[in-house]
């Protein structure tokens, strides 16, 4: 049985009071982001005041190599699975996932890693059904800052640039989706590293209405792509 509930010390540092005086910045509200170097930090997303759990991990070299090799082939990839996990001991059936790339170095390690993430996600939430999507993207799928209308979503980028997000107060939530309202100061835009694992709490998490994590897809540079995996709680 997987467990993510070992003690965690949040790494966030309070923002200076002068930060609130920046033009266009609205006052902070009672939400924070939990960031750490072990998977246990992901469990902090269960706390009411947390809308992001971010595990700042470094991918094993063979898994990182797999992602880079896959992207180098310049082939399309868009796969979805609905995975049933009837009990805590059930293992996700990832047979066939990215099977067209199974001859690449690191494929088995990638599958093992994805399987662990599914199991950990299900264990943390008590989920019996998990939706998995694996995609190669050459452009920003959701280029404007927005919130997800789901309870919680796991996202990790195996190769390429990672997702971007905002701390509370960096943008007026009433203007989400409007390009003119997005932060102009690049220091206000946070970037998730390749290989890191994030849990984004959305608007449909009980008690989190109006506080879903604000984020967007990054725009890859011309000729660049990204390999991204997402998990959703289906039941």
Stretches found by the model and what they are:
Residues 2-98, 108-116:
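N-terminal auxiliary "cap/dimerization" subdomain that precedes the catalytic jelly-roll/cupin core
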Residues 39, 140-143, 213-216:
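Glycine-rich, charged/polar anion/phosphate-binding loops
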Residues 49-52, 151-154, 195, 225-226:
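Short, surface-exposed beta-edge/turn micro-motifs
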Residues 63-65, 165-167, 201, 208-209:
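Short helix/loop capping segments that flank catalytic or ligand/cofactor-binding pockets
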Residues 92-139, 147:
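Extracellular-facing segments of soluble proteins and assemblies that are Gly/Ser/Thr-biased and enriched
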Residues 114, 134-136, 156-168, 217, ...:
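Active-site environment of non-heme Fe oxygenases that use a 2-His-1-carboxylate facial triad
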Residues 139-196:
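Catalytic core of non-heme Fe(II) oxygenases with the double-stranded beta-helix
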Residues 183-235:
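Catalytic core of Fe(II)/2-oxoglutarate
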């Amino acid at each position: 049985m997987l467990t993510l509930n070992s003690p965690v010390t949040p790494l966030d540092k309070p923002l200076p009071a002068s930060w609130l005086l920046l033009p266009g910045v609205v006052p902070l509200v009672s939400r924070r982001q939990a960031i750490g170097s072990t998977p246990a930090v992901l469990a902090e997303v269960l706390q009411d005041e947390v809308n992001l759990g971010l595990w700042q991990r470094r991918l094993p070299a063979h898994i990182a190599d797999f992602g880079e090799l896959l992207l180098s082939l310049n082939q399309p990839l868009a796969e979805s699975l609905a995975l049933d996990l009837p009990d805590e001991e059930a293992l996700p059936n990832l047979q066939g996932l990215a099977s067209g790339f199974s001859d690449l170095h690191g494929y088995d390690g990638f599958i093992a890693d994805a399987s662990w993430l599914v199991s950990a996600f299900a264990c943390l939430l008590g989920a019996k059904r998990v939706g998995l999507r694996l995609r190669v993207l050459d452009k920003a799928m959701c280029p404007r800052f927005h919130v997800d209308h789901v309870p919680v979503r796991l996202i990790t980028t195996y190769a390429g640039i990672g997702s971007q997000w905002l701390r509370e107060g960096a943008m007026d939530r009433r203007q989400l989706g409007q390009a003119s309202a997005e932060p102009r100061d690049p220091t206000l835009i946070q970037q998730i590293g390749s290989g890191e694992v994030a849990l984004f709490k959305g608007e449909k998490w009980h008690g989190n209405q109006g506080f879903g994590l604000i984020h967007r897809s990054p725009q890859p540079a011309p000729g660049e792509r990204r390999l991204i995996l997402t998990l959703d709680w289906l039941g």
